[in-house]
């Protein structure tokens, strides 16, 4: 039998091709979507209702990716980005979209993802929790890179999908007093003899002042310590040096650790402890969670992934008995201290593996209501045993709607109804979507 040779398409020519496309919508990562030769093309930076010229950069069986080259006709929703480092820094990716449209896009993406992945709709869609669009971050970690040739430190954020550190001198989403510290700190760090030992820099806007936390892989020299101390006193900040083992030394006159308050509950935290970076949204989020759970003094509430007590302590203020569970021992210790400082004796904290079955733990007992605030990976393992506890109500705070949708399935199968769903706009100017869901046992 004769065999005929069929040449494969020239993929290099396909990828170098420039095409003009009509953008119809945004995907859940904020990239524009268009159609080309029967495939969906994802175009970062493009907006719906725009005609754009792009270069194809990746071809898959059912989709392609492209680089935005030129906007032939732009959307009425396109705005001028505020940050001079936008599209270089990998932090923000939606500054080119008006804030109102950012929020409506996120709301739609949340509802669509839940419907698509969990095959359910909420009985009630709550108003989005929103705050200021700029100057909202009370905490940020900046990376450092030492250049062996120039012998200089680059201080900034990493480029998108890259380890490259982009030099940053201002950050409009960071609280302005923290943003104003970046440039002088960059100058200071480059004056240190031990700058090669710099790991990262963390900036914190706490209720008791501003903090700069330097991660060092080697001990500071006396000369460098004096320079840092003088800077801390000049700027009236607390400067904390953190070593390899997590130990820290406070330099300067302000010898204290950071805290934030929720009403009359004070939450201390240390470098490395997780806290929500948007203070105003966190306050609204905690209030909404407490309202949705509607706890009563005779009820027992389980708070999984409790951290330093962000939800546990406000829940305990309602009079209910609260059990907080966390996988990081240092945060459990801090949560216990925070409860004691607030005079709350109706809350207990435990350290354990959150993926393990805790239903037989003697300290757990009956659970009337549940709050969980997991990391992006979600709480699928925990929900396998939690459903046996049959709490009457569950508030799930999610930083990844895909995980929330996946984790909803075992709850829905065991008689829970999705009563409420709401967007939490924790990170304006980015595509990141956070959400809160209320499940009740039918």
Swiss-Prot record:
| Keywords assigned by UniProt, alphabetized | 4Fe-4S, Iron, Iron-sulfur, Metal-binding, Methyltransferase, rRNA processing, S-adenosyl-L-methionine, Transferase
- Answer whether the UniProt record assigns the keyword Acyltransferase to this protein: no
The record, for InterPro entries, names:
23S_rRNA_MeTrfase_RlmD, MeTrfase_TrmA_AS, MeTrfase_TrmA_CS, NA-bd_OB-fold, SAM-dependent_MTases_sf, TRAM_dom, U5_MeTrfase_fam
- What chemistry does it catalyse, as a reaction equation? uridine(1939) in 23S rRNA + S-adenosyl-L-methionine = 5-methyluridine(1939) in 23S rRNA + S-adenosyl-L-homocysteine + H(+)
Active-site residues, Swiss-Prot/TrEMBL: 399
Record-linked Pfam families? TRAM (PF01938), tRNA_U5-meth_tr (PF05958)
Q: What is its EC number?
A: 2.1.1.190
The highest taxon in the source lineage is Bacteria
Q: Which residues bind S-adenosyl-L-methionine?
A: 276, 305, 310, 326, 353, 373
Report whether Nucleotide-binding shows up as a keyword of the record: no
- Which major enzyme category is it? transferase
Name the Gene Ontology molecular function terms of this record: 4 iron, 4 sulfur cluster binding; iron ion binding; RNA binding; rRNA (uridine-C5-)-methyltransferase activity
In the record, biological process GO terms are: rRNA base methylation
Q: Which residues form the TRAM domain?
A: 12-70
What this chain does, per the record?
Catalyzes the formation of 5-methyl-uridine at position 1939 (m5U1939) in 23S rRNA.
Q: What family is reported?
A: Belongs to the class I-like SAM-binding methyltransferase superfamily. RNA M5U methyltransferase family. RlmD subfamily.
The molecule here is called 23S rRNA (uracil(1939)-C(5))-methyltransferase RlmD
Designated gene of the protein? rlmD
């Amino acid at each position: 039998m004769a065999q005929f040779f069929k040449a494969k398409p020239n993929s290099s020519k396909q990828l170098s091709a420039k095409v003009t496309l009509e953008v119809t919508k945004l995907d859940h990562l904020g990239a524009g979507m268009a159609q080309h030769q029967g495939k969906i093309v994802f175009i970062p930076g493009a907006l719906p209702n725009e005609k754009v010229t792009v270069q194809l950069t990746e071809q898959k069986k059912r989709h392609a990716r492209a680089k935005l080259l030129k906007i032939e006709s732009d959307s009425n929703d396109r705005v001028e980005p505020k940050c001079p480092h936008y599209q270089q820094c990998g932090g923000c990716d939606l500054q080119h979209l008006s804030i109102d449209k950012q929020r409506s896009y996120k709301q739609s993406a949340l509802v669509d993802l839940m419907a698509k992945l969990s095959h359910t709709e909420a009985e009630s869609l709550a108003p989005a929790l929103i705050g200021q669009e700029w100057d909202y971050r009370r905490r940020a970690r900046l990376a450092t890179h030492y250049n062996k040739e120039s012998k200089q430190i680059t201080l900034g954020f990493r480029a998108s999908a890259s380890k490259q550190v982009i030099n940053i001198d201002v950050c409009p989403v960071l609280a302005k007093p923290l943003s104003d510290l970046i440039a002088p700190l960059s100058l200071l760090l480059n004056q240190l003899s031990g700058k090669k030992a710099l790991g990262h820099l963390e900036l914190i806007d706490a209720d008791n002042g501003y903090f700069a936390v330097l991660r060092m892989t080697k001990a500071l020299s006396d000369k460098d310590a004096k320079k840092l101390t003088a800077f801390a006193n000049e700027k009236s900040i607390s400067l904390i040096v953190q070593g390899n083992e997590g130990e820290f030394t406070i330099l300067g006159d302000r010898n204290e650790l950071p805290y934030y308050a929720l009403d009359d509950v004070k939450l201390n935290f240390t470098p490395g402890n997780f806290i929500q970076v948007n203070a105003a949204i966190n306050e609204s989020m905690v209030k909404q969670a407490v309202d949705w759970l509607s706890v009563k003094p005779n009820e027992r509430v389980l708070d999984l992934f409790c951290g330093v007590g962000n939800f546990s302590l406000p829940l305990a203020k309602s009079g209910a008995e609260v059990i907080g569970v966390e996988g990081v021992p240092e945060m459990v210790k801090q949560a216990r201290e925070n409860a004691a400082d607030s005079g709350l004796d109706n809350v207990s904290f435990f350290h354990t593996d959150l993926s393990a079955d805790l239903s037989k733990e003697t300290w757990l007992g009956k659970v009337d209501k549940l709050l969980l605030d997991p990391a992006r990976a979600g709480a699928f393992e925990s929900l396998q045993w939690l459903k046996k506890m049959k709490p009457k109500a569950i508030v799930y705070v999610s930083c990844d709607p895909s995980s929330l949708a996946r984790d909803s399935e075992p709850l829905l199968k065991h008689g829970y109804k999705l009563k409420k769903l709401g967007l939490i706009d924790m990170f304006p100017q980015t595509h990141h979507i956070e959400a809160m869901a209320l499940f009740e046992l039918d």
